[in-house]
């Protein structure tokens, strides 16, 4: 009976490995699809305008909240490396106060998966009121924040398509869009 028990244990180990391997392949397939959709959704004419704005702007403010903050901070660091004066904070009051000092020569970049945030809307409206160009990176191009933005880049979010209303968004797509802008 010992040999049979060992075989059974080995079989269960193999199945566990297969399941894990399959899970990894699923993640890869989902991410590939998400990236492809994100890149394909880019309007190159608009992208040229955005890139030219980013090159010529004097100051950049990058705002987000919650899960989007790591992407905002990463963007801020990247753009600082390009010699841009770039500001990003997790504190809403700071973001708002800073937006109220921006000029039309600057740019506000807003990162929001859902495109719905009263605080980010307040910051966007403040910038817009001063004729500052506003770029939104979002999963929902018809959201309230999109209405306030001059430029909208859509990050594909496969999870969101699977479970509507779920914005536990992958940070992959927004990160890739930042990479495109940084490129």
Give residue spans per PLM region.
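Short hydrophobic/aromatic-rich motifs at helix boundaries and adjacent loops
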Residues: 21-23, 46-49, 94-96, 152-154
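A ubiquitous structural signal for well-ordered alpha-helices
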Residues: 31, 38, 50-53, 123
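HTH-adjacent hinge/linker in prokaryotic transcriptional regulators
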Residues: 1-46
